Amino acid sequence: MNQELTNNPFNPLTPPKAFDEIKVSLASPERILSWSYGEIKKPETINYRTFKPERDGLFCARIFGPIKDYECLCGKYKRMKYRGVVCEKCGVEVTLQKVRRERMGHIELAAPVAHIWFLKSLPSRIGLMLDMTLRDLERILYFENYVVIEPGLTDLTYGQLMGEEEFMDAQDAYGADAFQANIGAEAIREMLSQIDLESEANQLREDLKEATGELKPKKIIKRLKIVESFLESGNRPEWMVMTVVPVIPPELRPLVPLDGGRFATSDLNDLYRRVINRNNRLKRLIELRAPDIIIRNEKRMLQESVDALFDNGRRGRVITGANKRPLKSLSDMLKGKQGRFRQNLLGKRVDFSGRSVIVTGPELKLHQCGLPKKMALELFKPFIYSRLEAKGLSSTVKQAKKLVEKERPEVWDILDEVIREHPVLLNRAPTLHRLGIQAFEPVLIEGKAIQLHPLVCSAFNADFDGDQMAVHVPLSLEAQLEARVLMMSTNNVLSPANGAPIIVPSQDMILGLYYVTLAREGMKGEGMIFADVDEVRHALDAGEIHLHSKITARLPQIDEEGNEIMVRFDTTPGRVMLGALLPLNAKAPFDLVNRLLRKKEVQQVIDTVYRYCGQKESVIFCDQIMSMGFKEAFKAGISFGKDDMVIPDTKWTLVEDARDQVEEFEQQYMDGLITQGEKYNKVIDAWSKVNDKVTDAMMGTISASKRDENDAEMEPNSVYMMAHSGARGSVTQMKQLGGMRGLMAKPNGEIIETPIISNFKEGLTVLEYFNSTHGARKGLSDTALKTANSGYLTRRLVDVAQDCIVRMDDCGTENTIKAEAAVNDGEVVASLAERILGRTAGEDVFIPGTDEIIVAKGELIDERKADAVEAAGVTTMQMRSPLTCEAEEGVCATCYGRDLARGTKVNTGEAVGIIAAQSIGEPGTQLTMRTFHIGGVAQGGQQSFQEVNVDGKVEFRNANLLKNANGESVVMGRNMVLAIMDDQGSERASFKLGYGTNVLVEDGKKVVRGDRLFEWDPYTLPIIAEAAGTAKFVDLVSGISIRDETDDATGMTQKIVSDWRTAPKGNELKPEIIIAGEDGEPMRNDQGNPVTYTMSVDAILSIEEGQTVKAGDVIARIPREGAKTKDITGGLPRVAELFEARRPKDHAIIAEIDGYVKFGRDFKNKRRIGIVPADESLEPVEYMVPKGKHIPVAEGDFVQVGDYIMDGNPAPHDILAVLGVEALADYMIDEVQDVYRLQGVKINDKHIEVIVRQMLQKWEIQDSGETTLLKGEHVDKAEFDSANAKAVRDGRRPAQGEPILLGITKASLQTRSFISAASFQETTRVLTEASVQGKKDRLVGLKENVIVGRLIPAGTGGATQDVERIAKGRDQVVIDAAQAEAEAAAALAAPVMEDAAPDTDAAE
């Protein structure tokens, strides 16, 4: 019988079919019939009294199979022995009940019906095929109009629509047989079947060659694409209209009797019943020869019911069930979070899992977790049963069960055995990155809570305020091995996002270590000298010295040769104790811990130990400093009371000063010297300056060291220790407790002018409290919204990057990108060493001025090399990047460089795309969850000057300065750069100077740190006269292009340029100010162009008409945006916007060529800016700019490629088109990093590069040449290359194309894998498109493989696949050799037996 079972066709033991790809295409009626086991003729389901399926109904046993295993419906045949017999009484085959999950039926439709997906999913495929609009199609399908199919010799045209009346008239006029017209899906089906695809395609190609204009070729290309896809896939157009509807197996749409005689049923049964009822009624009406109008109505209803079955609600009203709930159609089963893809295929529930609350387990080792005995007993049951049986304690599973239930003592012993060395996985939701699931060895504990090691909390982002975690048991040996080798917490010391240690002490431990490493003057035992660690320990225990005394001690160290030597250090007993834990290594000297350790330094220590002392040592070290930190923090007994918050004495004088200032600004505003906006900005500035001063004063008071009566230094202030060490709290929080709360933000990000002067210690007034609720509430609502947004961003990132895997070792490309230090506002935010660390050099790097190589080309740069490059004074170098990698699929290990989480070169098969997505997505959620901690206190405040932070010499580049009447130098150019050079002549800092900046230093002048270089007005953009003369106003007409704004508060009026385009006669105006000379003619500037200034909307005029103007005077001011608060809330949408590659609203315009600016004729409400190229051979280019926008260039200005002709955020597409891939990558990396840096989050650049690579995978065809590619089509780079290579081989003209940038959502939907795209978004659209094209999914990415239930082709799954591939290749070699041998033998045999020659052929 066992033999029988294994051969059973429905037995899971049969090996699954091996397949390499999945193809989806349209099903022909014959195909549907071949799947079907019979036609369903009745709408009945089951008999409600006997619960037996009705014959020929939707659950019919004859069609779908028996309801009980090996038993026919009437009960004549039972048991295995009748397997495969068909009962002659009830017609049921005797077999397993499971076949009801896989046998399909069908419904023969009495009239054809159009498939709604191909009709309504835009663009309508049927419409494209027939070249008809969707509206016309619907009119035919839903029986409103006739369509001419065969005009004959009449003067009707093919495809013409006619109403009932027209049709009758035409029949009367031409006779009934002179032409053919029809209505409904039959007509459409007939038209589709008449299409000859080949000739249609040729015809369209001809049309395409002759087509002109913008829209026509586009339409032809769309049609050509669909015709070609039908040709290629072997689908027939008429299959888009169905004559047979398949019925899915009944077990997939179950009907379950509930108690009380009611039934619970799947919605599909209702939908199918509708279809069957209408179909049967239609059949009857046709037999009865009912009037046309009735039949037509029934056909229309049949069409509607089939539409509802396939996609309910896509057309017409939604069909609802008894409880007014819309019925779930077949499409809804696939779509969305609850659909088949995301609910059941990509996310499954797991057995052998449990969850419980977590508590801290400080006495655990790093690789352990505490597992409650109760949980362990339940999770490891099968293991315990088998062990009990093996030990002979029970003979059956039942007996073992009883033993376990009684919890006999031997069971606990066995549990201990089972658990030993069997890792379990712990997971905390939300799992934002791969460190959210880690493996630990369980330690059995009493109680019901899981114990978690404190050091891994930051990786899980866990705390012990009631968080829960889930436990999973890896069952198979392979799973245990992977858990131990890859997922063990000890193997995940470094963060995959930035390569820094993530197993870092926090909070109490940091406070303890900080306290241990404090050094204080005048403590007991100061100046004592100790011979070794033991003496120090002894003295401490005896109380002869204090933990913080300054002493000298002799400690063992390792010198460069690796010998142990004793070295004397000036240190403290606390530091000696900590130093004793440090592994002995030349690279980890005692100096590492011989300093005050704050959080950052502790991280540095762990990093160094991990890098140089190996994993084992560093894990032990981490555990030891953790317990030391806890112990010392506990012994120190640090706590604080309200007197520890010190309010500085100077606070009130500072506040009074600020109040005076603010009053002065109010007065200036009343007098009309400044505008409302300027006053607001100045007030905010004044208050934020005061706030900073008060904070500084407070910090000064708190951090000052105090002495007691014995002149010994006292312990620092507790609050200060906590904040300074990085254990908890920040200066901002201390400021609110002891300084002043400062300015608050409104929910929309604006800052409220009146600050909160009180702090929490003094207590807020009622008004202040009310003001502060604003920001606090915004913080809370933000948190809720942002979490969702951030999760969605991560999901899109994962989807776009999921098939980016390391596939090869080296692609051998010569392409590289440039690496240089990231400078922000003249401050180095990321040094060159940081940026090249863990990357592959793309060129030999020399010490400047010599030919000595520091790093050879193709070498992986480690910490030592990176520091050497930086020390040698190299400022830029070329490095390999995933962006420029030429691997066909995925990326290569050399371009990617170091695997950040391991510190070694990345392994083949590493899923770097997903790691990149997680690294970018995870902090998004983190940060957004943490906005509200500061309670909406305004951060930011505008800077209006730049100080230099290095010593050096000033150097101007592209200088364009003008001295104004006050003798200040004003920048007049667009691309002036001020650089600070050191003595060797290398650049230390550089600043881009905006138009209107006042420069305070001379070219070539020496500056020292802290000097002011230049200043600017942060709130307005000035327009400055470049020549002296008289001001003449042109088209500045009061009431049309100028409004006089009288300020209610001050009674002063200002002239402000208003939007003249809205005024009745405004369209022709071109408001500008001309500087005229003595003769009334406009002055000319150096280039010989007239000096005119075009005014933009909202500019405030600073001069009157006819006034005499000196060079450098401000003519008008354009207000900039007010100071908004900076917060990742603004940041997260910014990151999403960058990755979605959206064009910003008022995006900058980038010059495409070098040349001179020339203004052309204005056009409606746009201004035309042209660039006349410097290079004669190029065509001039023109840009249209909305009128009234400020244009920073003037007539005749010389612009270079990449200069902004209009200010704003550039659109990434433009950067790609004008400046190329590398510039785009730089822009994306800088912008994304700016957002994260603001929050102090470090992310390695390569993650962003990987995502940008995925966004750049498609090429847009500019000219199709003589290939099959079509103009405007988006194809993969690989496809583009192969098509071109083929064309070149055949001597045809290759296609031209250029890379395009797709946003992450779009890129995900355009992946080669339709399964992956369908499971992401817009499922119906993706599947419709795929089936028309007959797409094949080659299962390369991760998602497709998860969905079809395979191991993913990454990591260990990738390794097994490689082995299989190699084995297959070797098999093939053997087969080929055997075949060749046979052929050779045949060839030898052939000449002898000449008659038999044809036979040998046949034999072969």
UniProtKB/Swiss-Prot annotation:
Gene Ontology cellular component terms for the protein in this record: DNA-directed RNA polymerase complex
Superkingdom, natural source: Bacteria
Catalytic activity, as annotated: RNA(n) + a ribonucleoside 5'-triphosphate = RNA(n+1) + diphosphate
Record keywords: DNA-directed RNA polymerase, Magnesium, Metal-binding, Nucleotidyltransferase, Transcription, Transferase, Zinc
Binding-site residues, Zn(2+) 2: 811, 885, 892, 895
EC number(s) stated in the UniProt entry for this protein: 2.7.7.6
Molecular function (Gene Ontology), one example: DNA binding
SUPFAM superfamilies, alphabetized: beta and beta-prime subunits of DNA dependent RNA-polymerase (SSF64484)
Record function comment: DNA-dependent RNA polymerase catalyzes the transcription of DNA into RNA using the four ribonucleoside triphosphates as substrates.
Subunit structure of this chain's protein: The RNAP catalytic core consists of 2 alpha, 1 beta, 1 beta' and 1 omega subunit. When a sigma factor is associated with the core the holoenzyme is formed, which can initiate transcription.
Family in the record: Belongs to the RNA polymerase beta' chain family.
Name of the protein: DNA-directed RNA polymerase subunit beta'
Organism field: Jannaschia sp. (strain CCS1)
